[in-house]
């Protein structure tokens, strides 16, 4: 009875969290992104793009269709909805936060304006006026912009927003992705050079996408590659269904969520410090994924992977020549056949440096003898993030990450915490499973709890007039969490067991301050752990946000 009650409680908690995430954002209108009221935005747009008109105004607040047999003598204003025109409009069209689709049968005797949207015109349609695509920020003087507008504007000036699509299909890889040239350096591969063909959602009529990479590690003396083929069905974006397959053989790491490959390569090349751990993974996978909206996507797949231990192959670094790289940790070798699934919800305005939006991801993986696998485990990970403005120049970013498992998690699947991006007052991966843990429990650490809170203050809140000071963003942060093995606290191995014992004394925590560039691409963290007064402050330098 107790076990059933705990299962029901766990399910209810998960349901509540996702209801809160999805429901909360659905009730939040797009206008709430801006510090300028919806009424003021509409008034400014009307004055600028319609102005004084003798025609009647027809105003709508939802998706609207002008059918082929309709003739509208007047101006059409659509707020937070899409407009499809098949008939005739004798007047101006203004759509705010929506798309305009003008079909072949349409005739428009006036201007067509889309504010924070797009205009799609079919070849045989007729528009006797101007077509204008613009942004809300263009309606107001610069000093009235939301701070997010200024960040986006500055980034776009230097081409740093090329990976963002106008409609922010955040669950789909649109536009320019990562660089096509790969350059890395680490203690296993030494110098790695390669080329990549990043995945994109492809064009309307090009339903197949080929993606992957090819490169060579000069110290490991081995080629690395991945080649994938995807085919989408039904709807290209909003309700896209996709089938795909890939084959690969490469030096892999699971540490990219802690530190980016670029940061790690720079640290290894210049500072003789390699933070990432590596292993060889080769095999193939099949997957199917379904977009339930432009922000919500589910995915299920099958993997057949072989894992091999990799040794350290170089000790060279440009500086600190007297040091040695640490040895690359061992893993459990073998063939892992698994079924995995994930569902995630993503409304972030920018994946690399988000300043608003939500992110939620629930993932699971199972591997067992029924799949002819050398491993037997189930693993589940839930991650929630929010980026919430609390004022014109203030924002709170939060992350909660929970991991659990059943069976015997191999070392390469065990949970690890400490240092960069996790518990910043502690050593990097200070809390991790190792061969001694494996010998005792026959499993890596199978429980994890991590929380991060950051309070961001924009320098404009002070307005000192000093150029350097006014470009520094101040971030106060608090981290808490730990990893452990369920057999330390209970003789039950179900995924929902092993958490009820937790007290605050079981949680590691730290606090600190960070100084960051306004775009968030450079930051210095100064953190102090809270479990002792003797340990010094920990200082880290980053070229990316921790989450």
Model-based region annotation:
Residues 6-13:
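Positively charged n-region of N-terminal signal peptides that target proteins for export
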Residues 242-277, 284-287, 322-332, 336-468, ...:
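C-terminal outer-membrane beta-barrel translocator/porin domains of Gram-negative envelope proteins
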Residues 340-343, 513, 517-519, 535-547:
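Outer-membrane beta-barrel "beta-signal"
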Residues 15-25:
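Bacterial N-terminal signal peptides
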Residues 189-191, 199-201, 214-218, 231-233, ...:
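Transmembrane beta-strands of outer-membrane beta-barrel pores
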